[in-house]
């Protein structure tokens, strides 16, 4: 054991010797040994990317240690009480620069099996003390110092006043001088309390406006995991630290006001103490309000009379949960105007723009250290729409869910009302409204800012932001985002621009360009075309899209350029301009006379793919051999094909299936009958982005049929017998 002790780093060895000092720390071991063991027995350990959590745990542990000393010492004789208090304060203050290291030393002793992991974290904790901490952790560290200094000054001032109370009758003149000195210290202490509150407000605003908002952005775009976005569990530890610091500050102010110090407090200072106490309570209310968040958002496109769910969470620790109980939470739906009124007054109200079924729940503590209210079966039964402008559609109107709760902290004259809003939602009554509803949501999510007026959006946003959001939407809904080439094609499509892809950071696009204005050549908008492609991928092509077998968003001329030097039978898949939600096959065709052309098969739509999948159709066509550039067709699509054999209705029948074939229109040149005619060949206008497709029709009119199965061997035999 002695050998292992000497192997410890010098700073830790020094702290260990301090722990075993025979003067004061022995009292800590005697009176708080079991408490320390219980506190650290199940203390969490962290992986390498969460080393900063040890700093928070260490600060909370030693703050709790001093508080535990106060409770234990209440039943001790005065002399022993003072010794115990001083030993606890000395233990913490003398190791302030290495609190995390001391905490890990204790953790090694209580949890030997985590020693290896903790040693790793100890090394990292040392490096993080060189300034590589988050701004929140630095602010919390400052607050811990301020709170501890306030505690020391409060205790010192009270002790001096108690001593003076005994001596003042014997020496009145000296007592008057002391009063002046106390008044200065009292003023300094009040100022220190005020600085602590202001610093706490600064840290809280940083946590809420920056880190909570960054976390909410991941709700808007779930597939994005920002390196700056902390998990809610980590953010909760920040809230817990703020709550502990301010609760201790409230106790310090209360102790100052209730002790014998009142005999020395001037009227002005006494009034300031009451004001500071009010400020602390107001901060605790604000902290709880900003700790109330929507963890699982309701759908942002909400269909009437359709079930949906949501979850709210209060980011506080067990100590406050015990004071709160299980308060009720109510949910209502409010309009954009009502949301703005709540935002401007910073107070919830009995607003409602509709009726929600199963809208009442309770906050309950979970074993995962979460304080949640789950709403798993809500249903929007009624919606009250506002007076819409003449040119404003139903899908342009935004709503939000308002979650509210109210509770009183036990043994405290402190009633707290908390509320929070969901992300904006569009309410629809029919599924065909979903397409335009998503334009409103995507645009709003892109324009979301922590300090904006709910739910106002600008008319223009940068194209780069929009196309990034579109890519994230594809990633979330169909499993893969867009390539740079896809984005280039979309840029030309959105701006109707034939120039090369070169977008500056200040290139803007309007909401009308995005989803209102139709193209002159085609009677649909950019978003309608894009959404139709997204929908057919989601419903019929997702596995192919994720597997990168579909290029999809590529211009016709670019596809022809890619295929121009490929061997006959090479093909690629692209979404067409002329048919919404249509996917076409471009392939290299070689005629009987050896001439090669890039031809395009008539687009398949969702109706076609319901009958027979795209993978099966591709395998039907012997003309197609290689997926661009050189992937054998069976290798790319074989695992996605499935036999479409239908069981006969009775044993007297056999089944047949439909297959896709190409129908080449007859050519005026009989010597080249297999070559498409001029109307089907690439025209001189093929470089025009919005030119009509030149196509070869695919034969789907070979329906499933049944044949009597007596002595018949083939379809031909059957017809010959008729």
Swiss-Prot record:
Expressed in hemocytes, pericardial cells, midgut, skeletal muscle and fat body cells. InterPro entries: p53-like_TF_DNA-bd_sf, SH2, SH2_dom_sf, STAT, STAT_linker, STAT_N_sf, STAT_TF_alpha, STAT_TF_coiled-coil. Residues 675-689 have a biased composition (Polar residues). It comes from the Eukaryota. Residues 545-644 form the SH2 domain. The keyword Transcription regulation applies. Its main location: cytoplasm. Disulfide bonds: none annotated. One of its GO terms (molecular function) is RNA polymerase II cis-regulatory region sequence-specific DNA binding. GO terms for cellular component: cytoplasm; nucleus. It is found in: Cytoplasm; Nucleus. Induction: Bacterial challenge results in nuclear translocation in fat body cells and induction of DNA-binding activity that recognizes a STAT target site. In vitro treatment with pervanadate (vanadate and H(2)O(2)) translocates protein to the nucleus in midgut epithelial cells. Forms a homodimer or a heterodimer with a related family member. PANTHER family: SIGNAL TRANSDUCER AND ACTIVATOR OF TRANSCRIPTION. Signal transduction and activation of transcription. Plays an important role in the segmental pattern formation in the early embryo by activating specific stripes of pair rule gene expression. The STAT pathway directly participates in immune responses in insects. Belongs to the transcription factor STAT family. This is Signal transducer and transcription activator.
